[in-house]
Amino acid sequence: MKTRIIYLCLLVIFSTTGCIPTQTIKGDGNITTENIPVSEYDCLELEGGGMVVNYTQSDVPEGLEIKTDRNIFEKYEFNVEDHKLKIRPKKEFRKHTNFRPTEFMVTANSRNLKKLAAAGSTHVNINSPLQAEEFEAGLAGSGIIQFHDTASFTNLKIEIAGSGDFVGHKVYCEELNGDMAGSNTIVLGGTVGIAEFSIAGSGTVRAFDCTMDELECKIAGSGDIEASVVNKIKAEIAGSGSVKYKGDPQDIQKKVMGSGKIEKVE
């Protein structure tokens, strides 16, 4: 847990506060819409500010449409490398540059998606049902990843560093792993077999609408977890964090150091 949390903290430092912008590039208001040919991809890597991404999983050929200011568009690159669609500033603008587009709309689709990583203030909407054996969602900064439809996985991994949010009201998976560093939020609904969460800081998990067979969690700081649990809870708290649960799990293992608490709620 400690190694992963340290990694997450470093990730958000270098992607946000660690590189203090020395120039701000504002959108010129000359909005352009560009359709960019892309090859097959199953991973999205996004970097930038003010970007709104609308993604759809579909059987039609991969597509990418960009709508933004002309001067912003010219300073970004859009390409597929090793099945990864990368949308990010060109190399000379990746450090010490703050982008303020008038608008920055990305519309993308692919047959498969197994990884999504966003750095900055990107807002990603998954607008279709999403299916995958393994899926990884990563946020560094103040971005949002939101599933607007059913999401079904065997294994789901969520990593958030900073103040970002992950929202999925219809998530169905056998195993879920969430690592959180900072003051972020995970909102879940649906059904999960085994859920594991590690929180460093003031992160929050809102999952009363998600039925979990087992919950295992470690909280360092003032993090909070709300969940509906059927069979087992194993919780470790160091600090003032809390675990609130609904349900009647018969196996409850807890270790608390500090003022943290684990309690059942109606």
Language model region names:
Residues 1-266:
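Intrinsically disordered, low-complexity terminal regions
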